Protein backbone atom coordinates (compact mmCIF):
# COMPACT_ATOMS: atom_id res chain seq x y z
CA UNK A 1 0.00 0.00 0.00
CA UNK A 2 1.51 3.34 -1.04
CA UNK A 3 1.38 6.49 1.09
CA UNK A 4 -1.73 7.85 -0.65
CA UNK A 5 -3.67 4.62 -0.12
CA UNK A 6 -2.62 4.67 3.55
CA UNK A 7 -3.79 8.26 3.95
CA UNK A 8 -7.11 7.54 2.28
CA UNK A 9 -7.58 4.54 4.57
CA UNK A 10 -6.92 6.74 7.60
CA UNK A 11 -9.47 9.31 6.40
CA UNK A 12 -12.06 6.60 5.74
CA UNK A 13 -11.52 5.18 9.23
CA UNK A 14 -11.76 8.67 10.76
CA UNK A 15 -15.16 9.20 9.14
CA UNK A 16 -16.27 5.75 10.30
CA UNK A 17 -15.20 6.61 13.86
CA UNK A 18 -17.31 9.77 13.75
CA UNK A 19 -20.37 7.66 12.95
CA UNK A 20 -19.55 5.05 15.61
CA UNK A 21 -19.14 7.69 18.30
CA UNK A 22 -22.68 8.89 17.56
CA UNK A 23 -24.07 5.36 17.92
CA UNK A 24 -26.09 5.07 21.20
CA UNK A 25 -24.85 1.48 21.63
CA UNK A 26 -21.22 2.67 21.57
CA UNK A 27 -21.95 5.67 23.81
CA UNK A 28 -23.41 3.36 26.46
CA UNK A 29 -20.27 1.17 26.44
CA UNK A 30 -17.82 3.39 28.37
CA UNK A 31 -14.71 1.32 27.65
CA UNK A 32 -15.35 1.08 23.89
CA UNK A 33 -16.37 4.73 23.68
CA UNK A 34 -13.08 5.77 25.32
CA UNK A 35 -11.03 3.52 23.00
CA UNK A 36 -12.73 4.87 19.87
CA UNK A 37 -12.49 8.48 21.11
CA UNK A 38 -8.77 8.01 21.66
CA UNK A 39 -8.37 6.49 18.19
CA UNK A 40 -10.27 9.40 16.62
CA UNK A 41 -8.13 11.94 18.50
CA UNK A 42 -4.94 10.15 17.41
CA UNK A 43 -5.88 10.29 13.71
CA UNK A 44 -7.38 13.80 13.64
CA UNK A 45 -4.10 15.64 12.91
CA UNK A 46 -3.26 13.24 10.07
CA UNK A 47 -6.70 13.61 8.48
CA UNK A 48 -6.63 17.42 8.69
CA UNK A 49 -3.15 17.50 7.11
CA UNK A 50 -4.24 15.06 4.38
CA UNK A 51 -7.28 17.17 3.51
CA UNK A 52 -5.11 20.29 3.33
CA UNK A 53 -2.66 18.34 1.14
CA UNK A 54 -5.47 17.39 -1.27
CA UNK A 55 -6.42 21.07 -1.47
CA UNK A 56 -2.81 21.94 -2.35
CA UNK A 57 -2.88 19.31 -5.15
CA UNK A 58 -6.06 20.94 -6.44
CA UNK A 59 -4.39 24.37 -6.27
CA UNK A 60 -1.52 23.06 -8.43
CA UNK A 61 -3.96 21.71 -10.99
CA UNK A 62 -5.90 24.99 -11.03
CA UNK A 63 -2.70 27.05 -11.44
CA UNK A 64 -1.50 24.88 -14.34
CA UNK A 65 -4.88 25.25 -16.02
CA UNK A 66 -4.79 29.02 -15.49
CA UNK A 67 -1.35 29.24 -17.15
CA UNK A 68 -2.70 27.40 -20.20
CA UNK A 69 -5.68 29.73 -20.43
CA UNK A 70 -3.77 32.97 -19.81
CA UNK A 71 -3.77 33.61 -23.58
CA UNK A 72 -1.16 36.37 -23.57
CA UNK A 73 -2.38 37.98 -20.34
CA UNK A 74 1.03 38.53 -18.76
CA UNK A 75 -0.30 39.59 -15.37
CA UNK A 76 -2.61 36.58 -15.08
CA UNK A 77 0.14 34.22 -16.22
CA UNK A 78 2.61 35.69 -13.69
CA UNK A 79 0.06 35.35 -10.88
CA UNK A 80 -0.65 31.73 -11.85
CA UNK A 81 3.06 30.88 -11.97
CA UNK A 82 3.57 32.39 -8.52
CA UNK A 83 0.66 30.34 -7.18
CA UNK A 84 2.07 27.20 -8.81
CA UNK A 85 5.50 27.77 -7.26
CA UNK A 86 4.00 28.35 -3.81
CA UNK A 87 1.73 25.30 -4.05
CA UNK A 88 4.54 22.98 -5.20
CA UNK A 89 6.66 24.06 -2.22
CA UNK A 90 3.69 23.42 0.08
CA UNK A 91 3.17 20.00 -1.53
CA UNK A 92 6.73 18.93 -0.62
CA UNK A 93 6.31 20.16 2.95
CA UNK A 94 3.02 18.32 3.38
CA UNK A 95 4.49 15.09 1.96
CA UNK A 96 7.31 15.13 4.52
CA UNK A 97 4.90 15.95 7.34
CA UNK A 98 2.45 13.24 6.29
CA UNK A 99 5.23 10.61 6.25
CA UNK A 100 5.94 11.45 9.89
CA UNK A 101 2.24 11.47 10.80
CA UNK A 102 1.88 7.98 9.30
CA UNK A 103 4.59 6.56 11.56
CA UNK A 104 3.17 4.07 14.09
CA UNK A 105 2.03 6.06 17.11
CA UNK A 106 2.90 5.18 20.66
CA UNK A 107 -0.51 4.36 22.18
CA UNK A 108 0.59 6.00 25.43
CA UNK A 109 1.57 9.38 23.92
CA UNK A 110 -1.64 11.16 24.96
CA UNK A 111 -1.54 9.89 28.54
CA UNK A 112 -0.72 11.56 31.82
CA UNK A 113 2.37 10.25 33.59
CA UNK A 114 3.63 9.13 36.95
CA UNK A 115 7.11 10.56 37.44
CA UNK A 116 9.59 9.07 39.91
CA UNK A 117 12.94 10.69 40.77
CA UNK A 118 15.52 9.17 43.12
CA UNK A 119 18.88 10.32 44.36
CA UNK A 120 21.34 7.56 43.39
CA UNK A 121 25.16 7.50 43.50
CA UNK A 122 26.61 10.49 45.35
CA UNK A 123 24.84 10.66 48.71
CA UNK A 124 23.63 14.12 49.75
CA UNK A 125 24.75 15.70 46.49
CA UNK A 126 22.71 13.16 44.48
CA UNK A 127 19.65 13.94 46.62
CA UNK A 128 20.13 17.69 46.09
CA UNK A 129 20.41 17.12 42.34
CA UNK A 130 17.21 15.03 42.42
CA UNK A 131 15.58 18.13 43.89
CA UNK A 132 16.96 20.21 41.01
CA UNK A 133 15.44 17.77 38.50
CA UNK A 134 12.09 17.89 40.29
CA UNK A 135 12.10 21.70 40.08
CA UNK A 136 13.06 21.52 36.37
CA UNK A 137 10.12 19.26 35.54
CA UNK A 138 7.73 21.35 37.64
CA UNK A 139 8.75 24.51 35.77
CA UNK A 140 8.54 22.76 32.39
CA UNK A 141 5.06 21.47 33.24
CA UNK A 142 4.05 25.04 34.06
CA UNK A 143 5.20 26.26 30.62
CA UNK A 144 3.08 23.51 29.01
CA UNK A 145 -0.02 24.28 31.05
CA UNK A 146 0.13 20.88 32.75
CA UNK A 147 -0.91 20.06 36.32
CA UNK A 148 1.96 18.85 38.53
CA UNK A 149 1.07 17.09 41.78
CA UNK A 150 3.65 15.65 44.19
CA UNK A 151 2.04 12.47 45.50
CA UNK A 152 4.78 11.24 47.84
CA UNK A 153 8.24 12.54 48.78
CA UNK A 154 11.00 11.64 51.22
CA UNK A 155 13.85 14.03 52.02
CA UNK A 156 17.32 13.70 53.51
CA UNK A 157 18.86 15.84 56.24
CA UNK A 158 20.15 18.56 53.90
CA UNK A 159 16.87 19.17 52.08
CA UNK A 160 17.64 16.88 49.16
CA UNK A 161 15.20 14.32 47.78
CA UNK A 162 15.71 10.64 48.46
CA UNK A 163 12.64 9.77 46.40
CA UNK A 164 9.67 11.64 44.96
CA UNK A 165 6.59 10.44 43.09
CA UNK A 166 4.52 12.95 41.10
CA UNK A 167 1.54 12.90 38.77
CA UNK A 168 1.80 15.13 35.69
CA UNK A 169 -1.54 15.68 33.92
CA UNK A 170 -2.35 17.48 30.69
CA UNK A 171 -2.20 17.25 26.93
CA UNK A 172 0.24 14.67 25.49
CA UNK A 173 2.44 14.60 28.60
CA UNK A 174 3.91 11.16 27.93
CA UNK A 175 4.86 12.05 24.34
CA UNK A 176 7.13 14.83 25.64
CA UNK A 177 8.55 13.31 28.83
CA UNK A 178 8.88 9.62 27.91
CA UNK A 179 12.51 10.16 26.87
CA UNK A 180 13.46 11.29 30.40
CA UNK A 181 13.67 7.79 31.91
CA UNK A 182 17.24 6.85 32.80
CA UNK A 183 20.25 8.01 34.78
CA UNK A 184 20.95 11.76 34.90
CA UNK A 185 24.52 12.65 35.88
CA UNK A 186 25.60 15.94 37.47
CA UNK A 187 29.13 17.36 37.62
CA UNK A 188 29.58 20.28 40.01
CA UNK A 189 31.32 21.50 43.16
CA UNK A 190 29.17 20.54 46.18
CA UNK A 191 28.51 23.24 48.78
CA UNK A 192 30.33 21.05 51.32
CA UNK A 193 33.48 20.81 49.15
CA UNK A 194 36.19 23.05 50.64
CA UNK A 195 38.83 22.31 47.98
CA UNK A 196 36.66 23.37 45.04
CA UNK A 197 36.80 19.93 43.43
CA UNK A 198 34.12 18.88 40.95
CA UNK A 199 32.15 15.81 42.08
CA UNK A 200 30.03 13.50 39.95
CA UNK A 201 26.65 12.31 41.24
CA UNK A 202 23.63 10.62 39.73
CA UNK A 203 19.86 10.73 40.03
CA UNK A 204 17.49 8.36 38.27
CA UNK A 205 14.22 9.27 36.58
CA UNK A 206 11.38 6.93 35.70
CA UNK A 207 8.44 8.03 33.55
CA UNK A 208 5.40 5.74 33.40
CA UNK A 209 2.11 6.35 31.58
CA UNK A 210 -0.89 6.59 33.87
CA UNK A 211 -2.94 3.41 33.63
CA UNK A 212 -6.70 3.57 34.05
CA UNK A 213 -8.45 0.82 36.01
CA UNK A 214 -10.35 -0.33 32.93
CA UNK A 215 -7.09 -0.59 30.97
CA UNK A 216 -5.24 -2.76 33.47
CA UNK A 217 -7.03 -4.64 36.23
CA UNK A 218 -5.16 -5.93 39.27
CA UNK A 219 -6.76 -8.86 41.06
CA UNK A 220 -7.48 -7.69 44.63
CA UNK A 221 -6.20 -11.10 45.82
CA UNK A 222 -2.76 -10.13 44.46
CA UNK A 223 -2.56 -7.10 46.77
CA UNK A 224 -1.55 -6.96 50.41
CA UNK A 225 -2.64 -3.72 52.09
CA UNK A 226 -1.31 -2.62 55.49
CA UNK A 227 -2.67 0.40 57.36
CA UNK A 228 -0.45 2.27 59.82
CA UNK A 229 -0.02 5.65 61.51
CA UNK A 230 1.55 8.37 59.34
CA UNK A 231 4.86 9.63 60.73
CA UNK A 232 6.26 13.16 60.70
CA UNK A 233 9.76 14.59 61.06
CA UNK A 234 11.84 12.59 63.53
CA UNK A 235 9.59 9.59 63.08
CA UNK A 236 6.84 10.60 65.49
CA UNK A 237 3.29 9.51 64.71
CA UNK A 238 1.32 12.55 63.62
CA UNK A 239 -2.17 11.03 63.31
CA UNK A 240 -4.24 9.44 66.06
CA UNK A 241 -6.12 7.52 63.37
CA UNK A 242 -4.15 5.15 61.13
CA UNK A 243 -4.31 6.75 57.67
CA UNK A 244 -1.04 5.71 55.97
CA UNK A 245 -1.20 2.86 53.47
CA UNK A 246 1.41 0.30 52.44
CA UNK A 247 0.40 -1.68 49.36
CA UNK A 248 2.32 -4.68 47.99
CA UNK A 249 1.69 -6.47 44.69
CA UNK A 250 2.46 -10.01 45.82
CA UNK A 251 3.38 -11.62 42.44
CA UNK A 252 6.02 -8.96 41.63
CA UNK A 253 6.94 -7.67 45.09
CA UNK A 254 6.29 -4.09 43.94
CA UNK A 255 5.57 -1.91 46.98
CA UNK A 256 4.03 1.54 47.42
CA UNK A 257 3.70 3.54 50.63
CA UNK A 258 1.42 6.57 50.81
CA UNK A 259 0.84 8.92 53.75
CA UNK A 260 0.57 12.38 52.20
CA UNK A 261 -3.23 12.59 52.44
CA UNK A 262 -5.25 13.07 55.63
CA UNK A 263 -7.60 10.15 55.03
CA UNK A 264 -6.92 6.46 54.60
CA UNK A 265 -9.18 6.27 51.53
CA UNK A 266 -7.32 9.03 49.67
CA UNK A 267 -3.96 7.42 50.47
CA UNK A 268 -5.33 4.05 49.33
CA UNK A 269 -6.59 5.55 46.03
CA UNK A 270 -3.24 7.20 45.30
CA UNK A 271 -1.29 4.06 46.25
CA UNK A 272 -3.46 1.98 43.92
CA UNK A 273 -2.94 4.46 41.06
CA UNK A 274 0.85 4.25 41.49
CA UNK A 275 1.01 0.49 41.94
CA UNK A 276 -1.19 -0.06 38.87
CA UNK A 277 1.20 2.04 36.78
CA UNK A 278 4.28 0.28 38.22
CA UNK A 279 2.91 -3.23 37.68
CA UNK A 280 1.77 -2.43 34.12
CA UNK A 281 5.17 -0.86 33.46
CA UNK A 282 6.94 -3.92 34.93
CA UNK A 283 5.24 -6.29 32.51
CA UNK A 284 5.59 -3.85 29.61
CA UNK A 285 9.35 -3.81 30.28
CA UNK A 286 9.50 -7.60 30.22
CA UNK A 287 7.64 -7.64 26.89
CA UNK A 288 9.93 -4.95 25.47
CA UNK A 289 13.05 -6.80 26.59
CA UNK A 290 11.84 -9.86 24.70
CA UNK A 291 11.45 -7.90 21.47
CA UNK A 292 14.10 -7.78 18.80
CA UNK A 293 16.61 -4.95 19.39
CA UNK A 294 15.59 -3.22 16.13
CA UNK A 295 12.06 -2.80 17.43
CA UNK A 296 13.07 -0.99 20.60
CA UNK A 297 12.84 2.76 20.82
CA UNK A 298 15.83 4.28 19.09
CA UNK A 299 16.26 6.97 21.73
CA UNK A 300 16.43 4.54 24.61
CA UNK A 301 13.21 4.97 26.56
CA UNK A 302 13.64 1.45 27.90
CA UNK A 303 16.86 0.78 29.81
CA UNK A 304 16.39 2.37 33.23
CA UNK A 305 20.10 2.18 34.08
CA UNK A 306 21.21 3.90 30.87
CA UNK A 307 23.10 7.15 31.43
CA UNK A 308 21.14 9.47 29.22
CA UNK A 309 22.29 12.98 30.12
CA UNK A 310 25.08 14.91 31.86
CA UNK A 311 24.64 18.31 33.51
CA UNK A 312 28.04 20.02 33.85
CA UNK A 313 27.75 23.11 36.06
CA UNK A 314 31.29 24.57 35.64
CA UNK A 315 30.81 24.65 31.85
CA UNK A 316 27.06 25.47 31.94
CA UNK A 317 26.70 22.45 29.64
CA UNK A 318 24.02 19.81 29.12
CA UNK A 319 24.85 16.77 26.98
CA UNK A 320 22.31 14.18 25.87
CA UNK A 321 24.43 11.11 25.16
CA UNK A 322 21.80 9.26 23.11
CA UNK A 323 21.74 11.77 20.26
CA UNK A 324 25.06 13.56 20.79
CA UNK A 325 23.36 16.87 21.60
CA UNK A 326 25.39 19.41 23.60
CA UNK A 327 23.97 22.77 24.69
CA UNK A 328 25.71 25.48 26.71
CA UNK A 329 22.38 26.32 28.34
CA UNK A 330 22.34 24.39 31.61
CA UNK A 331 20.93 27.32 33.57
CA UNK A 332 17.97 27.86 31.22
CA UNK A 333 17.25 24.12 30.90
CA UNK A 334 17.16 23.65 34.68
CA UNK A 335 14.84 26.68 34.76
CA UNK A 336 12.32 24.56 32.84
CA UNK A 337 13.07 25.65 29.27
CA UNK A 338 13.45 22.08 27.99
CA UNK A 339 11.87 22.41 24.54
CA UNK A 340 15.16 22.43 22.63
CA UNK A 341 16.23 19.14 24.21
CA UNK A 342 12.84 17.44 23.94
CA UNK A 343 12.22 18.60 20.35
CA UNK A 344 15.64 17.23 19.33
CA UNK A 345 14.83 13.85 20.90
CA UNK A 346 11.43 13.67 19.19
CA UNK A 347 12.95 14.62 15.81
CA UNK A 348 15.76 12.07 16.16
CA UNK A 349 13.27 9.34 17.06
CA UNK A 350 11.06 10.19 14.08
CA UNK A 351 14.03 10.31 11.70
CA UNK A 352 15.29 6.90 12.85
CA UNK A 353 11.83 5.38 12.46
CA UNK A 354 11.48 6.84 8.95
CA UNK A 355 14.85 5.37 7.96
CA UNK A 356 13.79 2.00 9.37
CA UNK A 357 10.51 2.21 7.44
CA UNK A 358 12.34 2.98 4.18
CA UNK A 359 14.77 0.04 4.42
UniProtKB/Swiss-Prot annotation:
SUPFAM superfamilies (UniProt xref): Release factor
Membrane-spanning ranges: none
Keywords of the record: Cytoplasm, Methylation, Protein biosynthesis
Localisation per UniProt entry: Cytoplasm
Chief location: cytoplasm
Post-translational modification: Methylated by PrmC. Methylation increases the termination efficiency of RF1.
Keyword Magnesium: no
InterPro entries named in the record: PCRF (IPR005139), Pep_chain_release_fac_I (IPR000352), Pep_chain_release_fac_I_sf (IPR045853), Prokaryotic/Mito_RF (IPR050057), RF-1 (IPR004373)
Record keyword Metal-binding present: no
PROSITE patterns the record matches: RF_PROK_I
HAMAP family according to UniProt: Rel_fac_1
Similarity remark: Belongs to the prokaryotic/mitochondrial release factor family.
Protein name: Peptide chain release factor 1
Amino acid sequence: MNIYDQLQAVEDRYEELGELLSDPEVVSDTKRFMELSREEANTRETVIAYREYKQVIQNISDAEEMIKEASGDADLEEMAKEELKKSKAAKEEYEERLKILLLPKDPNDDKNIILEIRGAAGGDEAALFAGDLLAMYQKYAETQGWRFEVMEASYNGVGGIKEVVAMVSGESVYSKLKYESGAHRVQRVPVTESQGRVHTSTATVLVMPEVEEMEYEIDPKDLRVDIYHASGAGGQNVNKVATAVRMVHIPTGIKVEMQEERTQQKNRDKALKIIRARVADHFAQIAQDEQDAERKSTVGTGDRSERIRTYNFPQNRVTDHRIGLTLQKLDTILAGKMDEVIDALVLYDQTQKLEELNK
